[in-house]
Amino acid sequence: MRKIALFLSLCVFIWASDLQQALEYEKQGDYKKAMEIYKKLALKNSSVLISQEQNNSSQTTQTQNSITIKKEEKQDFSHLALANYLGENESFNPLGISSYKMNYFLPLAYSFNSLGTNNNKSEAKFQLSVKKRLFENLLGLDEKYYIAYTQTSWWQIYEHSSPFRETNYQPEFFIDFPLYLKDYEFFNNLRVGILHESNGKGDENLQSRSWNRIYVSTAILYNKFLFVPRLWYRIPESKKDDDNPAILHYMGNFDVNLAYLGDDYFINLMLRNNLKFHDNKGAIQVDLGYDIFNNGIYWYLQYFNGYGESLIDYNKHLQRLSTGFLISY
């Protein structure tokens, strides 16, 4: 701005000097020289105006570009969530590691039911979940091969010494097959995987829990609705090694997730059921997330009602309300 002001001051000084000289020529009766100076001043003035208009136009273009960039920064959340599910967002990480399931920390997790002797109904719950692409297109179908790891913990932070009441570990391997359906473009993929789940405990207190599943799932995105059904088959174990023989009775053979993905919030509903009318068991979970600071960190509310929230409680009915923060979806 200081340089512009000095330049304009110099221009005004030169213009005033030329104008004074033209007036002197008029007084002397030399109208020809006076007109030449007036013409020269007019050309200079028009040149300055053109330069100013070009400068204003350039500034306007820069401002519009800046606004466009800012608008592009806020992307459609529904496509971000789908990209995360399909593993398309890992290019932002040089190691190719990306989030898999929800990653959250819920310091306020209250159970309306007893959690056993000497356990506080109030605790913290958190989950870490990542995936890594290994390779792709071995079959010529544009398929992608992944390993993934999810850990969910229930932490008695309000008790003396703050022990971990339960931790579930879920390593898995899966293959994503893209679907190219001309008339059904909302069908995005077919996923086939094998999943191990364990609480990492020994048999000394009869608290060991583990099982293995083969599953198939797909993701269906229609406008801002995301639908993810998943079916599984439990890999059989011998009676000697099976430490939770009735787990299918409480967990069933499927779950479905239905989510509405707004611009800065999401609502997700998870349903699971054994489809037995005479002895029905299952679970429902409702997730609400709102991007408070517009930076990808969500205020997160989770409500669970049913069986199988954790392996240690898979055969116990629990109702829980939890809140905290979610950092990826």
Where do the model's predicted regions map?
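Gly/Thr-rich phosphate-binding loop signature of adenosyl cofactor/nucleotide-binding cores
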Residues: 126
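Outer-membrane beta-barrel "beta-signal"
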Residues: 318-329
